């Protein structure tokens, strides 16, 4: 596609704004799920017949409201989410149309566009009032068709160096695991943004406050390069428990960009590593920031991370330095780290790291880090459990949630049953076709029902076998016979 003309650029800018006052007013209107207006009292019956409802009444006028259609309500919620993430350059209305091809008809209306310092986000929103199966082949194909042209147009206006992420956001649509829609989105590097993702990002906003952008970028641009400059840091290489690790000192600003916290939440099930972390405690985060800035405080204990080695292009490299010692197995050298999002999983120390996010020292201080390289998932999980069992107790809900990962391959039968119960309950809570979908609090997700009563009920029921470490005390065959008799 040829470059945009001056008139085309102006047409796009007319529907975008970075005016703080205007954005604040838009946010107030968009966060309300209802359309509202004031009408004359003698007009009220006409509006009531069209689905409006009365809110308040004055002498001659009435304040009325009407629930926004599902599609527009969802678009407004996504817009507000970006506003709460800190974006202050957004589309002003729903009439933003971009020319993406050479033909006059090659145009597309964009639902939500958010411009950040490093990236531009383009969101296609699809919503329905009631839960229904997804079928978006045409919509995804259309997005694939206009993507490159829209990307070029937005970069021409807002900066060639900006990343552009396309998001396909849905509400109340169910996707079968491994379905064609999911494959199409993945193949075209379009981020699939479901109800679970929306809930997770909003929980991040509440917990992380102004520091949320680091975790959000890690989620959106997982394993994508920040830039082509590599990070080279002096380090000591050692082995412990049969695993390679490095001791190094790194600026918090750097670790915030390449790091990622694996929260125990539905949205992170797509990540191939174990998810186990609790969300940050906002008051604790604020206290750490004040401790660093106002009291010149510091934390001499090491943050523990694990470098993800699943992609060859993002693997770290250690080069020996000259003049090393033969008196120790520890090796002195330089660690080269790819400058990419979400390649360093923070096992312990997330509050310390994020406490620096708003600090004036995030670029000048360095913090001690113990970094594992390609630590197996079960070992990473055990480190987290070992550390936290001797510090703040792991919540009963999180412990039961982790049973599946900890005990699925256990040699002990009773432990495997713990894993099975955990898996069954989580499936009930995650499957959108289940009556319990999103109603069971799993990991760090909040819901009306707790996981523990379900685990207790299953363990006492006759639906699953009973077992000691080495043998079943109630056979599966006997359970089937009992159920058959009851039927």
In which residue ranges do the predicted regions lie?
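Intrinsically disordered, low-complexity Ser/Thr/Pro/Gly-rich regulatory segments
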Residues: 1-226
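Glycosyltransferase catalytic domains, chiefly GT-A lineage
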Residues: 98, 124-126, 293, 299, ...
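Short, flexible/disordered intra-domain loops and linkers
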Residues: 102, 131-139, 276, 313-322, ...
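Solvent-exposed functional surfaces
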Residues: 109, 363-487
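Well-ordered, non-membrane alpha-helical segments in soluble/globular domains
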Residues: 136-151, 179-181, 282-288, 420-421, ...
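Short helix-terminating capping/connector loops at secondary-structure junctions
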Residues: 156-163, 296-299, 362-364
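N-terminal leader or domain-start segments enriched in small/polar residues
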Residues: 175, 180-340, 371-374
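A short, basic-hydrophobic beta/loop patch
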Residues: 300, 305-306, 327-387
């Amino acid at each position: 596609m040829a470059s945009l003309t001056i008139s085309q650029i102006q047409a796009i800018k007319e529907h975008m704004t970075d005016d703080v006052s205007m954005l604040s007013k838009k946010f107030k209107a968009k966060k309300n799920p209802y359309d509202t207006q004031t009408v004359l009292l003698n007009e009220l019956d006409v509006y009531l017949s069209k689905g409006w409802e009365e809110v308040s009444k004055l002498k001659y006028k009435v304040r009325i409201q009407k629930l926004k259609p599902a599609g527009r309500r969802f678009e407004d919620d996504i817009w507000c989410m970006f506003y709460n993430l800190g974006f202050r350059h957004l589309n002003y209305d729903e009439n933003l149309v971009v020319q993406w091809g050479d033909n006059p008809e090659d145009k597309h209306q964009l639902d939500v566009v958010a411009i950040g310092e490093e990236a531009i986000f383009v969101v296609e929103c699809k919503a329905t009032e009631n839960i229904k199966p997804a079928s978006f082949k045409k919509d995804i194909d259309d997005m694939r068709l206009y993507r490159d042209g829209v990307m070029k147009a937005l970069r021409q206006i807002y900066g060639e160096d900006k990343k552009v992420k396309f998001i396909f956001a849905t509400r109340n649509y169910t996707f079968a695991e491994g379905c064609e829609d999911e494959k199409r989105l993945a193949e075209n590097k379009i981020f699939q943004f479901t109800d679970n993702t929306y809930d997770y990002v909003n929980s991040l906003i509440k917990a992380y406050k102004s520091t949320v952008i680091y975790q959000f970028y890690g989620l959106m641009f997982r394993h994508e390069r920040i830039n082509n400059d590599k990070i080279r840091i002096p380090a000591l290489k050692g082995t412990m428990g049969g695993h390679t690790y490095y001791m190094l000192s790194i600026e918090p600003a750097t670790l915030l960009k390449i790091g990622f916290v694996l929260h125990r939440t539905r949205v992170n099930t797509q990540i191939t590593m174990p998810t186990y972390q609790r969300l940050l405690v906002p008051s604790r985060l604020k206290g750490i920031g004040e401790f660093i800035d106002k009291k010149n405080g510091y934390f001499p204990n090491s943050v523990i991370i694990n470098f993800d080695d699943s992609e060859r292009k993002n693997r770290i490299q250690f080069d020996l330095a000259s003049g090393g010692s033969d008196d120790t197995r520890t090796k002195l050298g330089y660690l080269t780290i790819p400058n990419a999002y979400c390649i360093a999983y923070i096992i312990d120390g997330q509050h310390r790291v994020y406490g620096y996010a708003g600090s004036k020292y995030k670029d000048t201080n360095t913090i001690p880090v113990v970094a594992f390289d390609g630590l197996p998932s079960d070992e990473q999980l055990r480190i987290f459990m070992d550390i936290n069992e001797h510090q703040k107790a792991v919540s009963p809900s999180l412990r039961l949630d982790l049973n599946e990962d900890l005990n699925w391959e256990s040699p002990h039968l009773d432990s495997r049953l713990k894993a099975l119960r955990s898996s069954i309950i989580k499936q009930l809570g995650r499957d959108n076709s289940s009556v319990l979908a999103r109603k069971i609090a799993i990991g760090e997700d909040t819901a009306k029902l707790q996981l523990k009563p379900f685990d207790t009920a299953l363990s006492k029921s006759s639906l699953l076998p009973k077992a000691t470490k080495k043998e079943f005390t109630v056979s599966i065959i006997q359970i089937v016979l009992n159920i058959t008799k009851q039927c």
